Every structure is written in C-alpha cells, then in structure tokens.
C-alpha cells in the first residue's frame, strides 16, 4: 500500500518516511526471496469463492522494447500488429472465475529467445511453464483454455500427461474427418472415417442451441493434426463470423465448451 500512496520515487528511504519501519528494515525484507506463485495462489484462494466454477487459461503477451542489451530481446508475435516484432514476450498462467468472468494471474514467465535444444520449439517452453506451475492451480480445475497457437499435438498430449484437458480453438482449415458409424462389411479392414469436415458446412453437424446470439453446432470427429478423436463445436454468430473450438470428446459438452471458451474471449 505504501508504494501506491507515497509521493516521489519508490526508494527505501522514501518508504520509511511514510511508515513506522526504518530504511534498513525495508532493505532486509526486500532482500529476501518471495515465492510469488504461492503468494498469488493464496490471494486467488481468498478472492474466488469456493462455490464458483473455475478454469485455467494460458496465453502469451508481447512487450515492446527498443533496447539492444536486454536479456531475452528478440522477435515475437505482436497480435496488435499481426506480425512478429522486436521485443519481449511473457507467458501467463491464470485462474478464471467463470461466474464473474474475471481472470487472476497465477504465474508469469519470460519466453526465451531459443529453446533448450534444437528439437524443441516455443510450444515446448509454454508446456514446460504449465507443467512446472500447474501444482498451484485449484484442485477442482481440470480444464485449460488456450488459443489456436497451442492446438498442437505436443501441447495437447503434454496436458493429458498432467491430468488436464485442453479447450482450444482450431484453424479455419483444420484437417478433420467424420467417424464412420454405418454397418461394416464382413470382409476386409473396417472403415474408420466417413469424409472430411468442411468448416462452414453444417449439414452433418448436430445443432445444440443458441447462447448469447451464437448458434452452436457440434460433432465427434478425428483431428489429423492432434492424432486423436475430439469434440468440435462450431460457433456461428449473427454477423456470420465463425469459430471452431475443441475438447476431448469424452470430457466436454458442446454448450459447456462454448461458455468456457467464451469466458476467455470476451
């Protein structure tokens, strides 16, 4: 509170002028290590009521920097400009209160310029961030909401190993195949798939209903990129804008997935 209220520079000497503590006391305490993840966890535990529905969210944020010597300075994607620019990037893991539609930051890590080895990409860095800090998530959180960049086999399978399920977006050109549900022939290999799902063609999708002016359609399909069967939810808005989200087909209902994904997008 002192840092917010004091006038002038935020120095130990200035802090001591506005409190009963001495400059040396501030110096000693600021020299001690603080577990910020545990600090944030305790704060989130007090803020979000235990009865509220919660999910986790992971996303990266671009920070503009013009220096040359700053650690971690490199080219990262800037969503405001829709292109890669020089700067810094941080990966943020948050807990989302669905009832209040509010996200609370739990953990933040700076994205390194290069991966630890040649076989890894930045997706591995994001996954490593989640694996190392997911222990601080509330025990009733089992879903992680992400955008389309995280919809990759490496990330999805890594989450499943940790016991979490991903709710993410898919590209408009995602390679999806309908599952064959008809009668199999007595001889030969059984037919597994029944044609490709064309984004925009809702003739073979099941209509779920409408939520906040968005029509929901769903289907159980095979995703070639993720190499697994998933539930997709096709969102069609009044302005004809569309989006596709997904989850493991055994764990989520279409309406629930749209609400959870919409909580992050709004």
Give the residues covered by each predicted segment.
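A common structural microfeature
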Residues: 9-12, 23, 52-57, 90, ...
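Exposed alpha-helical structural elements
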Residues: 11-14, 25, 38-43, 175, ...
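Short, mixed-charge, low-aromatic patches
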Residues: 1-2, 81-87, 253, 257-258
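Single, function-defining residue in the core of a domain
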Residues: 6-8, 19, 51, 65, ...
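Gly/serine-rich nucleotide phosphate-binding loop at the start of the catalytic core
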Residues: 1-35
């Amino acid at each position: 509170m002192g840092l917010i209220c004091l006038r002038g520079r935020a120095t130990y000497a200035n802090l001591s002028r506005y409190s009963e503590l001495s400059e040396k006391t501030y110096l000693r305490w600021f020299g001690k290590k603080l577990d910020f993840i545990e600090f944030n966890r305790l704060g989130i535990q007090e803020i979000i009521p235990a009865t509220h529905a919660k999910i986790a969210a992971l996303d990266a944020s671009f920070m503009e920097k013009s220096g040359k010597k700053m650690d971690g300075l490199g080219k990262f994607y800037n969503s405001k400009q829709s292109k890669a620019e020089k700067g810094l990037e941080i990966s943020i893991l948050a807990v989302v209160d669905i009832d209040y539609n509010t996200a609370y930051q739990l953990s933040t890590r700076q994205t390194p310029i290069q991966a630890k080895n040649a076989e890894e990409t930045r997706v591995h860095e994001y996954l490593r961030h989640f694996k190392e800090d997911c222990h601080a998530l509330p025990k009733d959180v089992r879903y992680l909401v992400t955008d389309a960049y995280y919809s990759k086999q490496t990330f999805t399978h890594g989450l499943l190993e940790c016991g979490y399920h991903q709710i993410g977006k898919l590209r408009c050109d995602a390679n999806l195949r309908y599952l064959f549900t008809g009668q199999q022939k007595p001889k030969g290999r059984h037919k597994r798939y029944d044609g490709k799902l064309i984004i925009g063609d809702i003739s073979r999708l099941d209509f779920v209903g409408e939520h906040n002016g968005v029509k929901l359609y769903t289907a159980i399909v095979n995703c070639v990129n993720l190499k697994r069967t998933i539930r997709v939810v096709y969102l069609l808005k009044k302005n004809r804008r569309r989006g596709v989200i997904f989850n493991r087909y055994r764990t989520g209902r279409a309406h629930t997935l749209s609400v959870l994904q919409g909580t992050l997008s709004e």
